[in-house]
Amino acid sequence: RQRFGVPIERYHDKRRAEQLRGLIRPFILRRLKTDPNVVADLPAKVESREFTHLTGEQASLYESCVRRMLTQVDEAEGMQRRGLVLAALVKLKQICNHPALALKEGPVAMGGGPIDPSRSGKTIRLLEMLEEVLAEGDQALIFTQFREMGAMLAPMLAHHLGKQVLFLHGGTTQAQRQQMIDTFQRAEGTYPILLLSLKAGGVGLNLTAATHVFHFDRWWNPAVENQATDRAYRIGQTRTVQVHKYVCRGTLEERIDQMIESKTELASNIIGAGEAWLTELDTRQLRDILTLRNDAVEDEA
């Protein structure tokens, strides 16, 4: 790690990256879907970012969390500091998803019904896009790294879209898992939406009935995200796959999205991407990443 990891990840040392590439080249054979010799008839994959705004409630929660976190980080060192950084990043991502997730309100709101989509810019946009997907008779996968978020989204989507929504997560039994997959793959239109927790549904599934993949929140490691997308974009897929990655403007999500793209470019050269780089940021860098920008909340005027 000291010889290659730190120089490459932190300082973007091209010479060390070239040395590492030379060392591992004899031991790694990469076979990419973009190589026509590997898969000649795989259709196109179109990736896009869906930029959303925070609601006023989200912005207030976000700024409060940032102030508290920066104060704590200034007083901590070593492993304690790293833990505080990661915990704060998770909390801020939860706020970006929906206030109910960050406030631990549970899947059913106080009124007895599903969560209110108008409290989050992401859920507002997700409903709009899914209405278009369903109008075309298409099917969709929705990935989230938070099981609790999936539990909130499922009843909300079913209520507003009038369709049954399947939810596959770590607590799903093997029998239930296979039944969900079979139901979704039959493509009869009754169950056109499959929600998946990223770790439980990100690998080992064939879900080619889907032509839209939504990443409701982003993972630190792009390879994990790509594996999830490949549940739909794989051998057996006959139509173009649209991949939608949600990013909240003016928040840490937008800055981390830019950093992820940098990591992806680096990973394509040295085959690998880690997560430790997030905890290595100094307080000045953290403040720059976390501070809410002026464009985070949409100007109602």
Regions found by a protein language model. Name each.
Residues 29, 39-66, 173-176, 180, ...:
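SF2 helicase/translocase ATPase core recognition
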Residues 1-38, 237:
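Conserved P-loop NTPase motor "coupling/switch" region that bridges the ATPase
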